[in-house]
């Protein structure tokens, strides 16, 4: 494979191929997800579903040793909505249609019949959920209602790359309807924090979290909270977002509920989502020149156990069976393979596929463990393995985060002067700085430096000067080029 540090683009393309992650679709910006990538996406779905399920599920045994995902105090029910809607529906919310118009896939003809009202392939589902809820009856007693769907969406993109920017991609989108704005906003923040938990604590991806600027927030949102990560090339990648929608959609679509005063009132809504773009973040953050490197919590196969016994030694087989039983007791996702030849080839493919630990039993006394992160092979007796394996997994998890954080720290500059900022941009790095955030500044950043304000991390408590305008700064922000 190409060297990741020297040619990230070529390295990424080769990784997708060698790890058998995607096959390119016939239409630009579409991909066929192969088992290795889709199973990874299913594990991320599991994390989210477990935290939001009606019956809160808990990971078994070994996974409890990590920081667990804190289940949300909300009931989220799974639904599936249509892909098609009418273009006229999008025109009911001006900011929404203006924000999405350049990206919409429109169907203007069916067979030989031209459509008076074109159909839209779903770019997002705020409108579809409003139309669903409009057909239902609500009172303050049965609100909130929160629905989630795992689906695909369509947005026309000029420059496409698998996982990072696609014309068709997969995501989950959660939509909630509330009787008041305070609780709707609180839910948006709670789901945003859940994304932080998944991305940072489970996927080991360092992140910057905060509010989107008014120009970068979701079309129609009152506020958008984001989780941004910095990739090895210094570009930011938006990993997940959550939106306080207020009454932006519920009002024009005529949604009402019966309040405690027995009157009809307009409800409030929020939405949030994480997409297969997170797979791109995971690949770029952790993988190396030898292939995939996967976080323990989402690796579809966490351990591969090889029995390599050409002599048919009974005690070697018994040791392998003992290791198999141990892995079952620890509720680990593992694969047991009896190998008669070409063990090296099997281990090499396991390395490319990012298996966190490969265990080799080829004698009655020891188990060899190959650690994917460190690429070191170590021999353990069964007793040592049984007593230390949980610790090894914990070390793997922490070392993965620490390694990723060290790379991010090299790609982000804390700056106080315009000279420092411009030098960072020239070096293709992201910038943390205090600014007076205005439309003029955001336009200047795009036109002059080809960067954007990725998120506002906090409002300043102490006086600082904006290096761009010389005026009093108000926000501490992350500025970067973006995928």
From Swiss-Prot:
Known catalytic reactions: tRNA(Pro) + L-proline + ATP = L-prolyl-tRNA(Pro) + AMP + diphosphate
- Gene3D superfamilies from the entry? Anticodon-binding domain (3.40.50.800), Bira Bifunctional Protein, Domain 2 (3.30.930.10), C-terminal domain of ProRS (3.30.110.30)
An example GO biological process term is: prolyl-tRNA aminoacylation
What Pfam families does UniProt report for this protein, alphabetically?
HGTP_anticodon, ProRS-C_1, tRNA-synt_2b
Which keywords belong to this entry?
Aminoacyl-tRNA synthetase, ATP-binding, Cytoplasm, Ligase, Nucleotide-binding, Protein biosynthesis
PROSITE patterns linked: AA_TRNA_LIGASE_II (PS50862)
Q: Does the keyword Metal-binding apply?
A: no
Claim: Membrane is one of the keywords in the record: no
At the top of the EC hierarchy, this enzyme's class is: ligase
Task: Report the principal subcellular site.
Answer: cytoplasm
Reported EC number(s) for this entry are 6.1.1.15
Q: Please provide, in alphabetical order, the Gene Ontology terms of the cellular component aspect for this entry.
A: aminoacyl-tRNA synthetase multienzyme complex; cytoplasm
Localisation per UniProt entry? Cytoplasm
What role is this protein assigned? Catalyzes the attachment of proline to tRNA(Pro) in a two-step reaction: proline is first activated by ATP to form Pro-AMP and then transferred to the acceptor end of tRNA(Pro).
How are the domains described in the entry? Consists of three domains: the N-terminal catalytic domain, the anticodon-binding domain and the C-terminal extension.
Q: Which family does it belong to?
A: Belongs to the class-II aminoacyl-tRNA synthetase family. ProS type 3 subfamily.
Subunit description: Homodimer.
Q: Know the name of this protein?
A: Proline--tRNA ligase
Which species is the source of this protein? Mycoplasma pneumoniae (strain ATCC 29342 / M129 / Subtype 1) (Mycoplasmoides pneumoniae)
């Amino acid at each position: 494979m190409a060297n990741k540090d020297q040619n990230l683009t070529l390295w990424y393309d080769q990784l997708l191929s060698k790890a058998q992650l995607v096959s390119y679709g016939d239409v630009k910006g579409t991909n066929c997800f192969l088992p290795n990538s889709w199973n990874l996406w299913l594990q991320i779905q599991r994390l989210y579903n477990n935290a939001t399920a009606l019956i809160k599920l808990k990971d078994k045994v070994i996974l409890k040793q990590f920081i667990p995902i804190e289940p949300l105090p909300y009931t989220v029910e799974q639904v599936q909505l249509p892909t098609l809607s009418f273009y006229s529906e999008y025109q009911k919310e001006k900011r929404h249609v203006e924000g999405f118009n350049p990206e919409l896939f429109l169907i203007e003809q069916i067979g030989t019949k031209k459509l008076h009202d074109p159909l839209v392939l779903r770019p997002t589902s705020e409108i579809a959920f409003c139309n669903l809820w409009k057909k239902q009856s609500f009172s303050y007693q049965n609100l909130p209602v929160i629905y989630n769907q795992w689906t695909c969406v369509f947005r026309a993109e000029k420059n496409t790359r698998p996982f990072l920017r696609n014309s068709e991609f997969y995501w989950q989108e959660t939509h909630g309807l509330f009787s008041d704005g305070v609780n709707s906003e609180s839910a948006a923040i709670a789901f945003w924090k859940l994304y932080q938990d998944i991305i940072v604590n489970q996927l080991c991806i360092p992140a910057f979290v905060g509010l989107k600027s008014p120009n970068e927030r979701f079309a129609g949102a009152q506020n958008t909270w984001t989780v941004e990560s910095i990739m090895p090339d210094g570009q930011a990648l938006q990993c997940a977002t959550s939106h306080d929608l207020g009454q932006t959609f519920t009002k024009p679509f005529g949604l009402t509920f019966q309040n405690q005063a027995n009157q009809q009132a307009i409800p409030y809504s929020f939405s949030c989502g994480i997409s297969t773009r997170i797979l791109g973040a995971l690949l770029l953050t952790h993988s190396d020149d030898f292939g995939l490197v996967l976080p323990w919590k989402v690796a579809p196969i966490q351990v591969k156990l090889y029995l390599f016994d050409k002599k048919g030694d009974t005690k070697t087989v018994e040791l392998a069976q003992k290791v198999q039983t141990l892995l079952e007791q620890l509720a680990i996702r593992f694969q047991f393979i009896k190998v008669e030849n070409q063990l090296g080839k099997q281990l090499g493919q396991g390395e490319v596929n990012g298996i966190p630990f490969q265990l080799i039993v080829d004698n009655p006394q020891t188990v060899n463990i190959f650690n994917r992160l460190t690429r070191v092979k170590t021999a353990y007796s069964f007793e040592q393995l049984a007593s230390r394996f949980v610790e090894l997994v914990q070390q793997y998890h922490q070392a993965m985060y620490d390694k990723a954080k060290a790379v991010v720290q090299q790609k982000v500059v804390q700056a106080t002067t315009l000279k420092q900022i411009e030098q960072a941009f020239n070096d293709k790095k992201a910038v943390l700085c205090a600014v007076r955030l205005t439309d003029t500044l955001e336009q200047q950043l795009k036109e002059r430096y080809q960067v954007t304000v990725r998120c506002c991390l906090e409002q300043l408590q102490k006086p600082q000067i904006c290096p761009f305008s010389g005026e009093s700064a108000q926000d501490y922000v992350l500025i970067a080029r973006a995928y």
